[in-house]
Amino acid sequence: KNIGIFTLIGILILCTAILNFINLITARSLKQIRENGIRKSLGATRLDVVKFIYSEVSIVCIIAFVAAVLITAMGLPFFNQLINKDINLETLANAQVIKAFIVVLLITIGLSGVYPAVVLSRYSPVQSIRGAFSQVRNGGLFRNALVISVFISSIALLSATLIINKQIRYLQNLDLGFEKERVVYFRLNGNMKQQPNAIKNMLLTNPNIVSASTISHPPSAMGNNGQGWQWENKPLDFDPLVFNWNGDPDLVKTLQLHMSEGSFLQEGQTHSVVINRCFAQLIGWSHFTGKTLSAWGNDYQIAGVFEDININSLGGATQPIAVFLPDGGWGQNFMAVKIAPQDVDETLTYIRKKLDAMEPAFINELTFLEDDFTQMLEPENNLQKLISLFTLFSILVLALGLTGMIMYMAEKKTKEIGIRKSLGEENLSIVSRMLSPLLTAGLVAALIATPLAWSLMGYWLQNYAKRIDIDILIFIQATLAVMLVACATVLLHISNAATKNPVDALRSE
């Protein structure tokens, strides 16, 4: 889904850039319309004018393509660091990639030059020399479509960025159902697996170690799920997957599990089980303590029910869990240790020293449970960084596109502005008049971008069982932010036209 989103965004930004380039080329060509008229009066055909326009477009696109390749090569280390990947230039040297680049370049050249070449080459020499701005039919509609498309891109991308940020914050602050802070775990290797109680007692002599527990798997990498559980009045066609977890009686203290019914397992309860709320809801009873479940030919008495916890992922669906005491060496693969908030580094050094003395082959690998769950957000963090980068590009493209539009408007309405100023109209009124179409285009774009981004991000959020609700306020914020950037860009360029001396504006060649 993320690859599809990136592809769609890349195409959207490329199309927006092409539309903006058309706007800029059109604005520039209007300044050369008399030059084209002179060419035609000297014998140039319409095809010659089209070739000239396309030659200019091709040169600009090729220079931009070469610059893009160089920027990509220079920025690749930064990009790899940004997304924690190792992409090299050999990937771009692939024959298929090169062919795709060439095709994109040719399409960009073809689309970028078609409007100015077709429209601005059709005038007669007399019309061109006189400056036939008013003869461009439907030009305003086309340029409005360009501006609206750029607004749609910017608003949609910024909305996506805000939604991703909100989802990441939601997952970061999600209640996992247990305490992951300052809990480290390590694998019990070699001799350590045969004497877990001795290791635990040794570690607990340190006052900065609050609790320790042997476990079959850490909650961040839970395995061993299976079917085959039986209970009274269970439907014959219902056989859910249940995660089977082993932990000693101190597990409830180490991870601060919350019991909602009964109590946690005690020493000697080898034929008892504790289940989570999700498993209890699948069973469907109103009371569980003391009742019996069966699996693999054994009966297990339910000692209690604990509140649901997140395992293996942050945004995944809650899974049914059954907890047993370790049975000999089975279920004692790891040990989890809860550390007090003071002197954490010294406590970690103490743990490593003791384990190295007991098992020389110990790899010195202590893993914070909190780091595991933080790492689970790496794909979302990478997506957030890339979408933010795309959004920055989109807003930059928006600013360039508006520059082209204002260049065109200022060129076309120079005399109109001069007449209005000579009749006493204030600069503020002139600026407001020229801003009005921009604001209208922004509002129309917001009406289109909002359902589009809402639909796409709703599709993306389906990746998560635990997710935020999309709020209309996000799209309002995105629209206001984009409009603010747009208005600032326009005001920077429009002030020159509005403050120009009306005598200079009305002077004809």
For each predicted feature, which ranges?
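Membrane-helix entry/capping segments
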Residues: K1-L12, L30-Q32, T45, G75-V103, ...
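Hydrophobic secondary-structure segments that place a key small or acidic residue at a functional site
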Residues: L241-Q319
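Intracellular coupling helices
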Residues: L19-V60, R122-F133, L400-A441, T499-S508
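C-terminal transmembrane helical bundles of large multi-pass transporters
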Residues: A361-T450, M457-W460
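Membrane-proximal extracellular/periplasmic loop immediately following the first transmembrane helix
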Residues: N165-D239, N244
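"Rare, low-scoring activations can occur
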Residues: K1, Q194-S213, R277-Q281, A295-Q384, ...
